[in-house]
Structure formats: structure tokens, C-alpha cells
């Protein structure tokens, strides 16, 4: 007989503002058995994360109010538990993995110090005994050369590596229940498969229950025993995974299942001139040792990449985290040093100084993965979008800048009336539209898109892809699209490059590479997607 590990009973949660309370979770009931995985699925703003954070009472009160219902762990109430009881549960019996590891990891401490803190606090282990367990756990979550990485700080890891460290930190305590809030969003498909397999193995070993919050339905198919679908704070459908995918009953569930990226890239203009020509691009970071931090070697992270990109064309750059995708983008932007040839619209860029690059900067723009990090929270939307105009078109008046901001907000599907609001007042998809508007207002020829849809749920992701296609067709934009989501790459890209550990494994027309991959590594990626 299965044992009920966690029971959420008719939970309603609200946020108080002055005299009014806005209900964000409304009468939700969920149950997780020991050894079972329940997937919680829904768009951003549907109440998934608020429900999960309520389990350990991690939401600030005020403004949060628990309006009704209860949450029971092994039959004991968590909503009414003392702080001392909760301290014994948090991170020990119930562990949590958050979506954004840069927020969760301490930037001032090494990996070893942060991981040891978990074992010291929850299991009373001494440093010598803990080191072996830390190395074993890092190795299991796929951190290469774990012993050498213990002295690294979070900023020295790729996004995927940081997420793997977060997962290792949560699993060190061998919890009874794991709450995973979008834990594989930043990971490529091969590492994603490793992490899912690891979670399944640990679940079997520990008989661990798991609440898995995600917008990736392919993961839900592979991992979940049961699925609960949330919309506007309510649980609209709940069933066994196989049944729900085969015959969804609620219209919203049906909409979610039909939101996978699809379609073809926009037709290339004829003739399409070469906009970007890259030859033998190489990036190496110095390795420093000793008291004087002398350079003793170099870590080559991008090795001799060559490609051309035409006006109106999209080139997909695909690979595992740490494969050199984002580093390649930074090198093309001349934000880090590199070797090789970069020619943009006939102009060699490598030997230009900062002042010489300035007139070219507005023609090459970038949209980053996480708008939470790339948008200044202290500026309103008008100030964020017009910032580039202040640098590149300083003669414009404030009124002229505002008119251009209004026009570009219309173009990306944002209400210009919201231009005086701040980033925190928008959803994830809206924030990404703000980032696209900021790039678009300078009328670029090339936009480097670094995982622009990976943190978005499927329905919003489809909307952003449609927007990118329409903007490309209208303005003849070239895109360098960095991604680990092969479904998105197939729908958007004309050409594709597969990277592994900084080297090109395969490149060519997207349709050909997806239909008849020549390399085993490419076939593995396609099989996992």
C-alpha cells in the first residue's frame, strides 16, 4: 500500500495590497505518494510556483496570506507548524531546486564551501568525509573534472553547469520529497536526459516523492506518473500521465498539448547577400596559478569555427551547456577576446578598437536568455528601450525617442500604455518582448539570440517564435540563434551548427542535418529531443 507523503487540501493563497487581497491560488488539492512523481504544468502566472513555495512557507508574509486549506507532510500540517519544525523539514526532508541557479547560489563562495554547508548543517558531516560525497554527487550530475571545479565560483560555470550544482546540492541530503521548479529549463537535451535518469535512479533508491514543475511536456511524458494542469490559479485537470496525454478533457490542456514549436523558417530573400563571414574563430581563457597568478596554460573553449550568415537568414548554434555556444556569441559581439577573422558586412572587426566599433554596434544587437538579469529593474520600460537611442542617436529629443519607443512596442505586441511600468510588473514572455524591442529599436541587421525562449512556457514560446519570424520577414533581419531546443531550431533556422566541447561536429542546411544526420553525436541529440 502506497503512503501519502504530501497532501495539499483545498489550498487558497492571496497577495494583500492595502485593503484588497488578490487570490493567486484558488482551492487547489494535490497528493503525492512516496516514490511518485507529480508534474505541475501551466503557463507562467498560473500559480505553479506559488503552490510549490507554499509547501515550505517560503513566501513572504505579508503580503502573502493563506486564505484557506492546509498542506500536510506525513499527515502533519506545515502551514501551522512552528519555525523550529519547519527548519527540520526545509532542505532536509523536503528539498527544493529552483529555476534560476544564479539567484540561488552564493556568488562569493566556492562550490565546495556551498556544498559542504549542506552536509554540515543537515547531516553533521566533517569536511574530510564530506569531500568524497560532494565529488561523487557532482560526478553523478555530470560535472566534468569535479575535483578541479570545487574551487570554482558560480560565475565560472555555464548556465547548465550551475543548474547541475543546484541539483547536487538538493540531493546531498537524500530528501523524502523533492520539489523541482523548472530544474532542467537551462539544460540541453543530452544533459537533461542525464538529469532525468539521475532523478529516476535516486527516486528508486530513496523511495522519494517528487513535485516536478515544468512547461516542457516532453519531460512530463518521460518522468511523471500523474499530471496536474493549472490555469489562472486553479487546477483544471488532473490525471495519470498516459491518460491525460492520450485524451485530455479540458480545452486548456488541449491547447497546451498543441503548443509545441512547429512550422518552417521564413523564406530567404533572393538574392541574399553575405552579412557575416567568420573564419577559424577561436577563444581561449588563460589559466592562472600561484601567488602572482601567472598564466600557465590556456583553456580553449571555441576551436576554429567557420561559417557565413546571409541577410534574412537564421543560423542555429546547438550544443550542450559548456560547448561554447554563448562564448561564440560574445566573441562575435567583441565582448571577449578571440582569434580568427570576423567580417561584418565587408568590415573586418577583429582589429577595431572600442571607438571604431561604436558606429557598428547598433547594427549587431543581442537578446539574452533571462530578461530578469538583462533588464535593469530600476528603469521603467520606456527608459530601458530608449537607452540605445541615447547612445547611438544623441541628437533625438525626448519626445522623438518616446515616439520611437511607442512604435516599437506596438511592433513587438506590447501595449505602449505600459511603458512607464517596471520589469517586475510583467510576465516572463512580456519581459522577453521588452528585450526584443530594446534590440529592434536601433534597426539592427543582425540579432544574436542567446536562448531567448528557453525560460518561457510553450504557449508563450510559440508566440515569441511567431514574433521573431514576422520581424525577420519585415526587416530582413539575420539571426544567430543559440539554443538547446531542437524543436525550436527546426522551426526557425535555415542553417545549423552542432557544437561539442568547442568544436564543430556537424553543420549544414537545417532540413538536411535533421533528416539525415552524418555524425553519431547529432543522431543522439535528435533521438533525445
From Swiss-Prot:
Q: Which Gene3D superfamilies match?
A: P-loop containing nucleotide triphosphate hydrolases
Matches recorded under Pfam families: ABC_tran (PF00005), oligo_HPY (PF08352)
The record lists the membrane-crossing segments as none
Please list the residues that bind ATP 1: 42-49
Residues covered by the ABC transporter domain: 6-257, 287-526
> Does Transport appear among the keywords?
yes
Q: Which InterPro entries match?
A: AAA+_ATPase, ABC_transp_ATP-bind, ABC_transporter-like_ATP-bd, ABC_transporter-like_CS, Oligopep_ABC_C, P-loop_NTPase
- Residues that bind ATP 2, according to the entry? 319-326
Lipid biosynthesis among keywords: no
Give GO BP annotations, semicolon-separated: microcin transport; oligopeptide transmembrane transport; peptide transport
Gene Ontology cellular-component terms listed: ATP-binding cassette (ABC) transporter complex, substrate-binding subunit-containing; membrane; plasma membrane
> Which keywords label this protein?
ATP-binding, Nucleotide-binding, Repeat, Transport
* Record GO terms (molecular function): ATP binding; ATP hydrolysis activity; ATPase-coupled transmembrane transporter activity; transmembrane transporter activity
| Family membership | Belongs to the ABC transporter superfamily.
NCBIfam families noted in UniProt? PRK10419.1, PRK11308.1, PRK15134.1
Please report the name of this protein according to its UniProt entry.
Uncharacterized ABC transporter ATP-binding protein YejF
UniProt organism field: Escherichia coli (strain K12)
Amino acid at each position: 500500500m502506497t503512503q501519502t507523503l504530501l497532501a495539499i487540501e483545498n489550498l487558497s493563497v492571496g497577495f494583500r495590497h492595502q485593503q484588497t487581497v488578490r487570490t493567486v491560488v484558488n482551492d487547489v488539492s494535490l497528493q503525492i505518494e512516496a516514490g511518485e512523481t507529480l508534474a505541475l504544468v501551466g503557463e507562467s502566472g498560473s500559480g505553479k510556483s506559488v503552490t510549490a513555495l507554499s509547501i515550505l512557507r517560503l513566501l513572504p508574509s505579508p503580503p502573502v496570506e493563506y486564505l484557506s486549506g492546509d498542506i500536510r507532510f506525513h499527515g502533519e500540517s506545515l502551514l501551522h507548524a512552528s519555525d523550529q519544525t519547519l527548519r527540520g523539514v526545509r532542505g532536509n526532508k523536503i528539498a527544493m531546486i529552483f529555476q534560476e541557479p544564479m539567484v540561488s547560489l552564493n556568488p562569493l563562495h566556492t562550490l565546495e564551501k556551498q556544498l559542504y554547508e549542506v552536509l554540515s548543517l543537515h547531516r553533521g558531516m566533517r569536511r574530510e568525509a564530506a569531500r568524497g560525497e560532494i565529488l561523487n554527487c557532482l560526478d553523478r550530475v555530470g560535472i566534468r573534472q569535479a575535483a578541479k571545479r570545487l574551487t570554482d565560483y558560480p560565475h565560472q560555470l555555464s548556465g547548465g553547469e550551475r543548474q547541475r550544482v543546484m541539483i547536487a546540492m538538493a540531493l546531498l541530503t537524500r530528501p523524502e520529497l523533492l520539489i523541482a521548479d523548472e530544474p532542467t529549463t537551462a539544460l540541453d537535451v543530452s544533459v537533461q536526459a542525464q538529469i532525468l535518469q539521475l532523478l529516476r535512479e535516486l527516486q528508486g533508491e530513496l523511495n522519494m516523492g517528487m513535485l516536478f514543475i515544468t512547461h516542457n511536456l516532453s519531460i512530463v511524458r518521460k518522468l511523471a506518473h500523474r499530471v496536474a494542469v493549472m490555469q489562472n490559479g486553479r487546477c483544471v485537470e488532473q490525471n495519470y500521465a498516459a491518460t491525460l496525454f492520450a485524451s485530455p478533457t479540458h480545452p486548456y490542456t488541449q491547447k497546451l498539448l498543441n503548443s509545441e514549436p512547429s512550422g518552417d523558417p521564413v523564406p530567404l530573400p533572393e538574392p541574399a547577400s553575405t552579412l557575416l563571414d567568420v573564419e577559424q574563430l577561436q577563444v581561449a581563457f588563460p589559466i592562472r596559478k600561484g601567488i602572482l597568478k601567472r598564466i600557465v596554460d590556456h583553456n580553449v573553449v571555441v576551436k576554429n569555427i567557420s561559417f557565413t550568415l546571409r541577410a534574412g537568414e537564421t543560423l542555429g548554434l546547438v550544443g550542450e551547456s559548456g560547448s561554447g555556444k554563448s562564448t561564440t556569441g560574445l566573441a562575435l559581439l567583441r565582448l571577449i577576446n578571440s582569434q580568427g577573422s570576423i567580417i561584418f558586412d565587408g568590415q573586418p572587426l577583429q582589429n577595431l578598437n572600442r571607438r571604431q566599433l561604436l558606429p557598428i554596434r547598433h547594427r549587431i544587437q543581442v537578446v539574452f536568455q533571462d530578461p530578469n538579469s538583462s533588464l535593469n529593474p530600476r528603469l521603467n520600460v520606456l527608459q530601458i528601450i530608449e537607452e540605445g537611442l541615447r547612445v547611438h542617436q544623441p541628437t533625438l529629443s525626448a519626445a522623438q525617442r518616446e515616439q520611437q519607443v511607442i512604435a516599437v512596442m506596438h511592433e513587438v505586441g506590447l501595449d505602449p500604455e505600459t511603458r512607464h511600468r517596471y520589469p517586475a510588473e510583467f510576465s516572463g514572455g512580456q519581459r522577453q518582448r521588452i528585450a526584443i524591442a530594446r534590440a529592434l529599436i536601433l534597426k539592427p541587421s543582425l540579432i544574436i539570440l542567446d536562448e531567448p525562449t528557453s525560460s518561457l512556457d510553450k504557449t508563450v514560446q510559440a508566440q515569441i517564435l511567431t514574433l521573431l519570424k514576422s520581424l525577420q520577414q519585415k526587416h530582413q533581419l539575420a539571426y544567430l540563434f543559440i539554443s538547446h531546443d531542437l524543436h525550436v531550431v527546426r522551426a526557425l533556422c535555415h542553417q545549423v551548427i552542432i557544437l561539442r566541447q568547442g568544436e564543430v561536429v556537424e553543420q549544414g542546411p537545417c532540413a538536411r542535418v535533421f533528416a539525415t544526420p552524418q555524425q553519431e553525436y547529432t543522431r543522439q541529440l535528435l533521438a533525445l529531443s
